[in-house]
Regions:
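Fe(II)/2-oxoglutarate oxygenase catalytic core
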Residues: 2-40, 44-129
Length: 129
């Protein structure tokens, strides 16, 4: 059963007791309301494929494709899903493992340069110190 625990009154909550890859409509409605209530939700222990992350994200509204811009062809080739990108400080053979490496690892707000920026971003942490 889903539980929402406030971390800071009115801002940020931990959500436990759910698997976001298998939410029924009622569970998603409760999760969505928690997002509206708290603005930031932390859901620990989620193990999602890129496609599952994309499907979960799409339940919040239309998705934006990764802006390729001036991204070199070698980095573009690493992108398996145009709606999910890997940002990592992990190197393999001296090269970053994700499409962006850790170039986006500093705080920023996604897509704010567009006329209608998205209302949210979803971060799936795989390996966190």
């Amino acid at each position: 059963m889903m539980q929402v625990t406030a971390q800071t009154p009115g801002f940020a909550a931990d959500v436990t007791g759910i698997n976001v890859a298998k939410l029924c409509e009622g569970e998603f409605a409760a999760l969505y309301q928690a997002w509206l209530d708290f603005g930031v939700l932390r859901l620990r222990g989620q193990r999602l494929s890129d496609d599952e992350l994309q499907a979960f994200s799409a339940r919040f509204g239309p998705l934006e494709e990764i802006p390729l811009g001036r991204m070199p062809a070698a980095q573009r080739a690493k992108i398996g899903n145009r709606y999910v990108t890997s940002i990592s400080n992990i190197l393999v053979d001296g090269k970053p493992i994700g499409g962006l490496g850790n170039a986006e690892a500093q705080w920023h707000s996604d897509m704010t340069y567009t006329e209608n920026p998205p209302p949210a971003s979803i971060l799936l942490g795989i390996e966190i110190p």
